[in-house]
Curated annotation (Swiss-Prot):
Region (Disordered) location: 87-110
Lineage, uppermost ranks: Bacteria, Pseudomonadati, Pseudomonadota, Gammaproteobacteria, Enterobacterales
Biased composition regions of type Gly residues, renumbered to the chain: 92-102
PANTHER family, per database record: UPF0229 PROTEIN YEAH (PTHR30510:SF2)
InterPro entries: UPF0229
Gene symbol of the encoding locus: yeaH
Designated name of the protein: UPF0229 protein YeaH
Entry's family note: Belongs to the UPF0229 family.
NCBIfam families: PRK05325.1-2, PRK05325.1-3
Highest taxon of source: Bacteria
Length: 427
């Protein structure tokens, strides 16, 4: 009886190795598709998996073929429209499948739809936040923030061909072949000794000699059938993410909820902050987040109230900056904490309050924070708050500002603000 043993450790994901290779090969196209898909999601559905589509021509394999130009002679079967020696005009286009869908219908042409496949939540978030980091992160005395880095972690029985360990695989192959053939080799050695004795004995024992030769041949065949290398022998270099202790950090999220912020603008601000929250919680451990909502008055709130409260009012931006300054002095010593802030507003502010915002940031907040980002969400012309902040940007290296006009700008602006910097952090 023949037994088939499934040694694959992937279980239901039997093509995991091929899947990982595919994700690496077409990472650029997948990231482009993800950046387009993130803007189409609802606010509460940012961290689930995603159906990714890639143009078919991007995944086509290179091949040699004749060019489409030049003069060709071909033989086609005749029909009621063409007869011998007729010349057929070359087609002038008319592909289908990946077209825009605009224009007149045609009876000619063919094409291929885009290749669509599903990626998991983890794969989606890994690609979404790749190459992002908190800027100017400083090593402080108390260490609680944990960043995960990839390290070698021995060997594993499954992996991608690029990580295969030839030496360890051959060692396993030798051990397996030795274990599977040791008993047969001892038996073979004993039979060969008996055959030598019988062959030299008198009188000759032909039947016994023939039986021994047959058993020896069968044993040798069994030994030779043991494969030199088996999938069970293969070992791959294993890598795992290990916590890398770093400095503790706090992120202040300041959101304008005044009456000038319509629902569409608030939704874009929420999308930005949800991306920020997912990035912090997935990339770092023990990062504290302080949520501040403001109109004419500022208030520190919890996560649920920050995203879903319907409270609104007038606009005094300095109230949020004053509250942040109070919280920093009360709970977050700059010598022990890396302090970050992200402020989102439509730029509409009481005119006399904008210079006060400039003063609070310049004298109190920017000297103690590692990085302060301001996002203005509006399609109107910039007002006094933006102009005051432009002076800060030219003076302070740890201040950045970006403009969001519609949903398509959210993810590119987010990556621009938090892209990983090669330069060393300042002290």
């Amino acid at each position: 009886m023949t037994w088939f043993i499934d040694r694959r450790l992937n279980g239901k994901n039997k093509s995991m190795v091929n899947r990982q290779r595919f994700l690496r090969r077409y990472k650029a196209q997948i990231k482009q598709s993800i950046s387009e898909a993130i803007n189409k999601r609802s606010v509460t559905d940012v961290d689930s998996g995603e159906s990714v589509s890639i143009p078919t021509e991007d995944i086509s394999e290179p091949m040699f073929h004749q060019g489409r130009g030049g003069l060709r002679h071909r033989v086609h079967p005749g029909n009621d429209h063409f007869v011998q020696n007729d010349r057929i005009e070359r087609s002038q286009g008319g592909g289908g499948g990946s077209g825009s869908g605009q224009g007149q219908a045609s009876q000619d042409g063919e094409g291929q739809d885009e290749f669509v496949f599903q990626i998991s939540k983890d794969e989606y978030l890994d690609l979404l936040f790749e190459d992002l980091a908190l800027p100017n992160l400083k090593q402080n005395q108390q260490r609680q923030l944990t960043e995960y880095k990839t390290h070698r972690a021995g060997y594993t029985a499954n992996g991608v061909p690029a990580n295969i360990s030839v030496v360890r695989s051959l060692q396993n192959s030798l051990a397996r072949r030795t274990a599977m053939t040791a008993g047969k080799r001892r038996e073979l050695h004993a039979l060969e000794e008996n055959l030598a004795i019988i062959s030299n004995s008198e009188p000759a024992q032909l039947l016994e000699e023939e039986r021994l030769r047959k058993e020896i041949a069968e044993l040798r065949a069994k030994i030779e059938r043991v494969p030199f290398i088996d999938t069970f022998d293969l070992r791959y270099k294993n890598y795992e993410k290990r916590p890398d202790p770093s400095s503790q950090a706090v992120m202040f999220c300041l959101m304008d909820v005044s009456g000038s912020m319509d629902q569409s603008t608030k939704d874009m601000a929420k999308r930005f902050y949800i991306l920020l929250y997912l990035f912090l919680s997935r990339t770092y451990k023990n990062v504290e987040v302080v949520y501040i909502r403001h109109h004419t008055q500022a208030k520190e709130v919890d996560e649920h109230e920050f995203f879903y409260s319907q409270e609104t009012g007038g606009t005094i931006v300095s109230s949020a900056l004053k509250l942040m300054d109070e919280v920093v002095k009360e709970r977050y010593n700059p010598a022990q904490w890396n302090i970050y802030a992200a402020q989102a507003s439509d730029g509409d502010n009481w005119a006399d309050d904008s210079p006060l915002c400039h003063e609070i940031l310049a004298k109190k907040l920017l000297p103690v924070v590692r990085y302060y980002s301001y996002i203005e969400i509006t399609r109107r012309a910039h007002q006094t708050l933006w102009r005051e902040y432009e002076h800060l940007q030219s003076t302070f290296d740890n201040f950045a500002m970006q403009h969001i006009r519609d949903q398509d700008d959210i993810y590119p602006v987010f990556r621009e603000l938090f892209h990983k910097q090669n330069a060393t952090a300042k002290d």
